């Protein structure tokens, strides 16, 4: 089966991890984030519902990209929200840097994964 990585454990990332797990589209979902402890706690919550909701997919929370090794699909939900006074170009620059860094880290551990970017549409070309 497929290994799926979700980068970003915020609202979009954690919901994506839950939905992929519930649908049994993958044998393993790895959720990673820069906030220490966040993806681990969310993974525990999702895993606790496995037996009640009757799905087999295991969810792993981590802050270490090496645990994403062998991912066939990567969903990038990481990014910062627009802050008051921030222009769209400033937001683009910040989030483009995040997507570039995430992509560099992912390809260190997974060869030729399918990458899905869930963020501002203007960032899609960054991950190519």
Show which residues each predicted segment covers.
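Conserved NAD(P)H cofactor-binding loop of Rossmann-fold oxidoreductase domains
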Residues: 78-80
């Amino acid at each position: 089966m497929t290994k799926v990585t979700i980068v970003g454990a915020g609202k979009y990332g954690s919901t994506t991890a839950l939905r992929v797990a519930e649908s049994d589209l993958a044998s393993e979902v790895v959720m990673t984030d820069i906030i220490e402890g966040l993806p681990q706690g969310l993974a525990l919550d999702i895993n606790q519902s496995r037996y009640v909701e009757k799905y087999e997919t295991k969810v792993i929370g981590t802050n270490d990209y090496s645990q994403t090794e062998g991912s066939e699909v990567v969903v990038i939900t990481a990014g910062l929200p627009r802050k008051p006074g921030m222009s769209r170009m400033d937001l683009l620059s910040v989030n483009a840097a995040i997507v570039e860094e995430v992509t560099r880290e992912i390809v260190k551990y997974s060869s030729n994964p399918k990458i899905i970017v869930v963020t501002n549409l203007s960032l899609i070309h960054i991950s190519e």
